[in-house]
């Protein structure tokens, strides 16, 4: 149903004009000797009923639920999403469409309606939308709403102050109300059809329409009120047939007024449901990762040795990320790397003289987490990198791995921050049978307040340098309360800062991390490759979990190279990119993906010659021969052009007839797109990187808000080709031609 606009309306009395018209018509009737019919207005019908001692049914009174658990005149309950444990509000990005549902009902056969009202942090109503009953048997009502308007403005850009004012705690209230018109219409149609107590039924309808016209908070225009008054007069006219009288109140014009400006009796608002509305890029984001030491790295022609890149040469990586349409550049730790127990190539225990070590073995005599590795440059170089990123419209996300090499300054300054063995030595990190001899884990039981204070100091330092996002390495191996305190302290001073959790762990821990402030998270998408796996996983990511845990889809990372990506070549890389970009509002690419770097280290699901342990020299001119960079660019362009890609709450899996063809749709109604036009994307992917497949794709047009009376004109956003679609549609996709369709409904 269309949005219901409610505003107080000062009505100019039309009594004199109405009376004049009635008298004129009565006079005209008296002039005709053949007829002595009497025409009555709705007011006359009501007065006549009162003189006969009849009770016209009173409208339901409005009763508010002033306390939690209290019911109003209309029952409203089981609202979703609800505040988790009554403490943690659901989280959405500014302008992100999301679904509200509730059970709304009343005693007996009376029909009800429901409306969702959105209010900003200052209590101002910003949206009011009628809900739709999707399951009458369970009294379940639903509607899509949004908090504020979507924006692409970055924290440093002009105009961001206006965005910032919209962030914070919003509320959505569900109002249940008695739908007197629909209740009357249901019974009146039956009574007229069987000619049972027709006059009472139609006079009741005339009274109802007249009351509807007089009600001040319906948002009716003067013209609308005239329409209802005239309909009431016609319905009360006993000179007309019962069918004609009923038609006065049962027609498309009255139905349209009911859709947009209904008569709402017994309005019963629920308790407001809180939502935490976060800044742009908290949900809808495109990430790009590269290692600064590999950007601009070259091979010395005289010695054959690698000359590593620096923060200055990393400007090329920024240019590439921006050209491909990404929003965020994610850098691994840029801090000094320890020497003691430094790892060699492919995570070997002994490093060679030219091995740079892992940037996750943090800290040396040159400094710790608050220092730039001199091999990369200086803090001024880092600030210049951030400044250039901002000029390109990119945010900088810095990896913050809270662990230390044996050479970290903390080891001497704060030995109590580390676990000690009985022999007095510090225990290195272990996850049996894996051992990380170059890393000392932190012991949070010794001095958590002291560690929190130091981490807050360091994060503030990098924020001042230009960082707007922290990607936290393995946050699930640290206390949740620690992160709760740190994130609260950092965002109190810098509310624009976002946190991503690199946490592959149990659902409970991932949910807890989202509660305490991690706006996005890595997830198990890389291992969801079959049709069955994806049909199960996509609705989970884009369902109720999406109100708290914003999964970011990465096809690969420095630590993850699955068999699917290894075995399916260019087509497989394109398939996984399409699934990542269209399957989640947040997705990311680790550089080298454009060059089909898909050789696994034997026995491990990671790349051989892992960039974590060495500098990689890449020839980016070869990227053109694969076409993957063009695919990444196209995907980001499509995402930015289509509001349907913005939300974690609008994905529907579509039935297909082939086990290798996956299809899903994203739909955002016109009222929520910001363009005034509905936006629907239909994504169809061939999961087989070696063979062509054909399939029928079924669309439930009405459920997707699409027209059912004519063919749909759809455009493939990847190729520009156009097709006509309907309920059932044939597709053929091949890895050497089109691996996917991304169809936009025109």
UniProtKB/Swiss-Prot annotation:
Family: Belongs to the glycosyl hydrolase 13 family. GlgE subfamily.
Cysteines joined through disulfide linkages: none
Gene3D superfamilies from the UniProt entry: Glycosidases, Golgi alpha-mannosidase II, Immunoglobulins, Phosphotransferase system, lactose/cellobiose-type IIA subunit
Name of the protein in its database record: Alpha-1,4-glucan:maltose-1-phosphate maltosyltransferase
Low complexity biased stretches: 10-32
Catalytic activity: alpha-maltose 1-phosphate + [(1->4)-alpha-D-glucosyl](n) = [(1->4)-alpha-D-glucosyl](n+2) + phosphate
UniProt source species: Bifidobacterium longum (strain NCC 2705)
SUPFAM superfamilies, alphabetized: (Trans)glycosidases (SSF51445)
A GO BP annotation: alpha-glucan biosynthetic process
Recorded GO MF terms: hexosyltransferase activity; hydrolase activity, hydrolyzing O-glycosyl compounds
PANTHER family given in the database record: ALPHA-1,4-GLUCAN:MALTOSE-1-PHOSPHATE MALTOSYLTRANSFERASE, GLYCOSYL HYDROLASE FAMILY 13 CATALYTIC DOMAIN-CONTAINING PROTEIN
Role: Maltosyltransferase that uses maltose 1-phosphate (M1P) as the sugar donor to elongate linear or branched alpha-(1->4)-glucans. Is involved in a branched alpha-glucan biosynthetic pathway from trehalose, together with TreS, Mak and GlgB.
Catalytic residues in the record: 473, 502
Matches recorded under Pfam families: GLGE_C (PF21702), GlgE_dom_N_S (PF11896)
Residues the record marks as site: Transition state stabilizer: 559
Region of interest: Disordered: 1-43
Binding partners and assembly: Homodimer.
Keyword annotations from UniProtKB, A to Z: Carbohydrate metabolism, Glycosyltransferase, Transferase
Residues binding alpha-maltose 1-phosphate: 343, 403, 438, 474, 612-613
Source taxonomy: Bacteria, Bacillati, Actinomycetota, Actinomycetes, Bifidobacteriales
Entry EC number(s): 2.4.99.16
């Amino acid at each position: 149903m269309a949005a219901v606009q409610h505003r107080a309306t000062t009505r100019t009395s039309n009594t004199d004009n109405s009376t004049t018209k009635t008298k004129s018509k009565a006079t005209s009737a008296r002039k005709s000797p053949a007829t002595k019919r009497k025409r009555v207005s709705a007011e006359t019908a009501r007065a006549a009923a009162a003189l006969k001692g009849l009770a016209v049914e009173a409208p339901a009174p409005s009763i508010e639920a002033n306390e939690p658990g209290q019911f109003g005149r209309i029952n409203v309950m089981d609202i979703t999403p609800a505040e988790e444990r009554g403490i943690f509000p659901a989280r959405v990005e500014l302008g992100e469409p999301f679904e509200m549902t509730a059970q709304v009902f009343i005693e007996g056969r009376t029909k009800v309606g429901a409306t969702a009202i959105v209010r900003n942090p200052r209590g101002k109503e910003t949206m009011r939308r009628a809900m739709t009953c999707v399951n009458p048997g369970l009294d379940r009502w639903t509607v899509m709403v949004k908090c504020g308007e979507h924006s692409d403005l970055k924290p440093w850009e002009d105009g961001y102050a206006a965005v910032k004012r919209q962030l914070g705690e919003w509320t959505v209230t569900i109002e249940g109300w008695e739908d007197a018109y629909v209740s009357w219409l249901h019974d009146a149609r039956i009574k007229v059809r069987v000619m049972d107590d027709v006059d009472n039924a139609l006079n009741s309808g005339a009274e109802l329409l007249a009351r509807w016209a007089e009600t001040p908070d319906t948002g009716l225009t003067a013209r609308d009120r005239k329409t209802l008054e005239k309909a009431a007069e016609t319905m009360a006219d006993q000179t007309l047939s019962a069918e004609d009288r009923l038609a006065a109140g049962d027609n498309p014009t009255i139905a349209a007024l009911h859709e947009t400006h209904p008569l709402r009796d017994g309005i019963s608002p629920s308790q407001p449901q809180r939502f935490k509305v976060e800044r742009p890029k908290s949900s809808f984001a495109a990430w790009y990762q590269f290692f600064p030491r590999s950007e601009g790295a070259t091979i010395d022609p005289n010695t054959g040795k690698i000359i590593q890149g620096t923060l200055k040469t990393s400007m090329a990586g920024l240019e590439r990320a921006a050209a491909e349409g990404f929003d965020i550049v994610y850098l691994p730790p840029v801090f000094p790397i320890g020497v003691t127990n430094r790892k060699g190539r492919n995570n070997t225990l002994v490093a060679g003289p030219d091995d740079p070590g892992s940037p996750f073995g943090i800290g040396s005599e040159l400094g710790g987490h608050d220092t730039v590795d001199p091999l990369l440059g200086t803090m001024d170089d880092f600030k210049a990198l951030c400044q250039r990123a901002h000029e390109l419209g990119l945010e900088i996300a810095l990896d913050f791995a809270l662990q230390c090499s044996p050479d970290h300054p903390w080891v001497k300054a704060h030995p109590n921050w580390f676990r000690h063995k009985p022999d007095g030595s510090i225990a290195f990190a272990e996850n049996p049978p894996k051992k990380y001899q170059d890393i000392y884990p932190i012991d949070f039981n010794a001095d958590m307040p002291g560690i929190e204070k130091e981490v807050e100091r360091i994060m503030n330092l990098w924020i001042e340098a230009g960082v707007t996002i922290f990607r936290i390495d393995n946050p699930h191996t640290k206390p949740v309360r620690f992160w709760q305190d740190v994130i609260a302290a950092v965002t109190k001073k810098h509310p624009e800062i976002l946190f991503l959790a690199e946490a592959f762990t149990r659902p409970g821990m991932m949910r807890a991390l989202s509660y305490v402030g991690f706006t996005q998270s890595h997830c198990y998408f890389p291992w969801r490759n079959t049709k069955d796996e994806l049909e199960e996983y996509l609705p989970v990511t884009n369902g109720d979990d999406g109100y708290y845990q914003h999964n970011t889809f990465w096809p690969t990372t420095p630590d993850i190279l699955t068999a699917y990506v290894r075995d399916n070549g260019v087509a497989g890389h394109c398939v996984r990119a399409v699934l990542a970009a269209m399957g989640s509002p947040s997705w990311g690419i680790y550089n080298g993906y454009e060059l089909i770097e898909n050789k696994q280290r034997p026995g491990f699901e990671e790349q051989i010659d892992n960039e974590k342990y060495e500098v990689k020299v890449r020839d980016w001119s070869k990227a053109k021969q694969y076409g993957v960079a063009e695919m990444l660019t196209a995907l980001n362009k499509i995402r930015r052009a289509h509001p349907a890609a913005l939300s974690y709450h609008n994905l529907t899996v579509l039935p297909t007839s082939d086990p290798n063809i996956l299809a899903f749709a994203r739909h955002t109604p016109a009222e929520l797109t910001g363009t005034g036009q509905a936006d629907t994307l239909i994504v169809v992917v061939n999961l087989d990187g070696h063979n062509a497949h054909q399939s029928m794709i079924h669309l439930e047009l009405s459920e997707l808000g699409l027209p059912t009376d004519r063919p749909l004109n759809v455009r493939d956003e990847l190729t520009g080709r156009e097709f006509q679609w309907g309920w059932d549609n044939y597709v053929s996709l091949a890895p050497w031609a089109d691996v996917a369709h991304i169809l936009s409904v025109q």
